[in-house]
């Protein structure tokens, strides 16, 4: 609950921790094919950010994960068309989600979806809506491997068919990660994250 989260944040602050990262875990009844709950102004993440900022103001830095997998009924990171994730339609949803997060008061947005070109499009959308100062920390390198299982379990995310190999990286490709990081640098991101995913 939000009340428990606020108590936990107070404990973290007393330990000298100055920032937190939020990841959504929502009820199945709010999930659909495109993850529309992600850009609901009254959604869980948005309420959490507002409440944290109301209670802690600028004493705690809030990073929000930006992805659709916790919001989609199928568990994939984007909109499914003809059995596969549609990159461009997914980016549209991510852009909507980024604006709602910004309007809620988030300090940093961290896209973890691995859609091609999403960092630049999110940056354009934020700038267009007056959120020039909100940094983007993309997961530039995210592998389709088995190391991310505990996280997916923690946020109750499971795939309903298929895998993520079409948009996440193969650990067998030792040079692709450099191209991905370069692409995000060119798209004016502010730092880069690397993570391992599971199928």
Predicted features and spans:
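Conserved small/polar residues in nucleotide/adenosyl-binding loops
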Residues: 191-198
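Alpha-helix-loop-beta-strand connector modules within alpha/beta enzyme cores
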Residues: 35-64, 119-140
């Amino acid at each position: 609950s939000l009340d428990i989260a606020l108590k936990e944040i107070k404990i973290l602050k007393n330990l000298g921790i100055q920032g937190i990262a939020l990841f959504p875990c929502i009820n199945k009844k709010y999930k659909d094919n495109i993850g529309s709950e992600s850009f609901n102004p009254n959604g869980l993440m948005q309420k959490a950010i507002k409440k944290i900022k109301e209670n802690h103001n600028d004493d705690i830095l809030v990073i929000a994960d930006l992805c659709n997998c916790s919001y989609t009924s199928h568990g994939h990171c984007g909109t499914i068309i003809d059995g596969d994730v549609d990159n461009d339609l997914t980016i549209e949803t991510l852009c909507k989600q980024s604006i709602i997060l910004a309007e809620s008061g988030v300090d940093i947005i961290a896209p973890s979806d691995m859609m091609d070109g999403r960092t630049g499009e999110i940056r354009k959308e934020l700038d267009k809506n007056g959120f020039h100062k909100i940094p983007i920390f993309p997961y530039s390198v995210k592998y389709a491997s088995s190391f991310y299982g505990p996280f997916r379990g923690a946020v109750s995310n499971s795939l309903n068919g298929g895998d993520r190999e079409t948009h996440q990286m193969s650990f067998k490709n030792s040079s692709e990660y450099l191209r991905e990081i370069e692409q995000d640098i060119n798209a004016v991101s502010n730092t880069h994250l690397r993570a391992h995913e599971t199928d």
